[in-house]
């Protein structure tokens, strides 16, 4: 399951209740985001030990600014609320699963 993040408060609650969180920062107009989104969802269905979330940067500009998102798609892995890995551009399901399994 992929959770759509709609506020900084919701994001904080997600961090508080999950050890590992991976977030796909995306936008409707972003071509590579349209390819990455389904891959991200497939990875989420395979890995139950990590919280998967998406942030639409056009709707949640405060979150995008807080995490300095300047390119799309950007996938960020957090452990205990701290950024551990950041990847920019298309990422296939296998790479996402590999990343969260480390």
Curated annotation (Swiss-Prot):
Pfam families according to UniProt: Thioredoxin
Transmembrane segments: none
Cited InterPro entries: Thioredoxin, Thioredoxin-like_sf, Thioredoxin_CS, Thioredoxin_domain
Keyword field: Disulfide bond, Electron transport, Redox-active center, Transport
A molecular function GO annotation: protein-disulfide reductase activity
Family according to the record: Belongs to the thioredoxin family.
Reported function: Participates in various redox reactions through the reversible oxidation of its active center dithiol to a disulfide and catalyzes dithiol-disulfide exchange reactions.
Name recorded for this polypeptide: Thioredoxin
Organism ancestry: Bacteria, Bacillati, Mycoplasmatota, Mycoplasmoidales, Mycoplasmoidaceae
């Amino acid at each position: 399951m992929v959770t759509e993040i709609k506020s900084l408060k919701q994001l904080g609650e997600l961090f508080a209740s999950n050890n590992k969180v991976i977030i796909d920062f995306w936008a409707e107009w972003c071509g590579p985001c349209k390819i990455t989104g389904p891959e991200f969802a497939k990875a989420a269905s395979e890995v139950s030990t990590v919280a998967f979330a998406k942030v639409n940067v056009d709707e949640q500009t405060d979150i995008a600014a807080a995490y300095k998102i300047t390119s799309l798609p950007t996938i960020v892995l957090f452990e205990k609320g701290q950024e551990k890995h950041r990847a920019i551009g298309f990422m296939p399901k296998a790479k996402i699963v590999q990343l969260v399994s480390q």
